Swiss-Prot record:
Protein name from the UniProt record: Ribonuclease HII
Cofactor note: Manganese or magnesium. Binds 1 divalent metal ion per monomer in the absence of substrate. May bind a second metal ion after substrate binding.
Protein species of origin: Pyrococcus horikoshii (strain ATCC 700860 / DSM 12428 / JCM 9974 / NBRC 100139 / OT-3)
Binding, a divalent metal cation: 7-8, 105
Annotated localization: Cytoplasm
The protein's role, per its UniProt record: Endonuclease that specifically degrades the RNA of RNA-DNA hybrids.
The keyword Transport appears for this protein: no
Family under the similarity heading: Belongs to the RNase HII family.
Reactions the enzyme catalyzes: Endonucleolytic cleavage to 5'-phosphomonoester
Main location: cytoplasm
Species lineage: Archaea, Methanobacteriati, Methanobacteriota, Thermococci, Thermococcales
One example of a Gene Ontology biological process annotation: DNA replication, removal of RNA primer
GO MF assignments: manganese ion binding; RNA binding; RNA-DNA hybrid ribonuclease activity
Segments forming domain RNase H type-2: 1-210
Length: 220
């Protein structure tokens, strides 16, 4: 029986894409994931993740990566949880090899509801099991987590080559906030790599617009 794991990387940052990773393997080969040291990507260094990524590509029967742009995130008409479920479905339906069982790291406080959302969108029959911290419980979800994280890390490096050093991209990072302010101050807008609906970006935009209005009023 083929089993799949699904996880994401980059849900919280104000910069960069949300990345969905899907991994598929025959249930009898799960042991091979353990043998190479697959575990939750958050417990691994970037170097360890890169090494495991290469090994995973050889071991897995199939895998798929989906990038969700900041524009898609900003223009969504529903919650982040629903967007995530929707994109999980797109990724799962894009697999060459369809699994009979799917393990998902639940973004919803109600894992059963999250599983139902995914099952409803599948174009094939499969059992969907959604759990919190599934990436720490199931090796196949850990594999998906590693694929998503490595892909996002690579994307972030490409963005840094183009836009400069913006830190981790997380709202709590002082370097990220500094970069957002400097960029907006210089160009009067954010580049397409920024999630404009995130509070950090909105506050910067509001502050600069307010200052501009005050300046315009003064100059009149």
């Amino acid at each position: 029986m083929k089993v799949a794991g699904v996880d994401e990387a980059g849900r919280g940052p104000v910069i960069g894409p949300l990345v969905i990773g899907v991994a598929v393997i025959d249930e009898k080969n799960i042991e091979r994931l353990r043998d190479i040291g697959v575990k939750d990507s958050k417990q691994l260094t970037p170097g360890q993740r890169e090494k495991l990524f290469s090994k995973l590509i050889d071991i897995l029967d199939d895998y798929y990566v989906l990038l969700v742009t900041p524009k898609e995130i900003d223009e969504r008409h529903h919650s982040m949880n629903e967007l995530e479920a929707e994109k999980f479905v797109v990724a799962l339906n894009s697999l060459r090899i369809k699994p009979q069982k799917i393990y998902v790291d639940s973004a919803d406080v109600d894992p059963k509801r999250f599983a139902s959302l995914i099952k409803a969108g599948l174009k094939y029959e499969a059992t969907v099991i959604a759990e919190h911290k599934a990436d720490a419980k199931y090796e196949i979800v850990s594999a998906a987590s590693i694929i998503a994280k490595v892909t996002r890390d690579r994307e972030i490096e490409k963005l840094k080559q183009k836009y400069g050093e913006f830190g981790s991209g997380y709202p709590s990072d002082p370097r990220t906030k500094e970069w957002l302010e400097e960029y907006y101050k210089q160009y009067g807008d954010f580049p397409p790599i920024v999630r404009r609906t995130w509070e950090t970006a909105r506050k910067i935009e509001e502050r600069f617009r307010k200052n501009q209005l005050t300046l315009d009023k003064f100059l009149k």
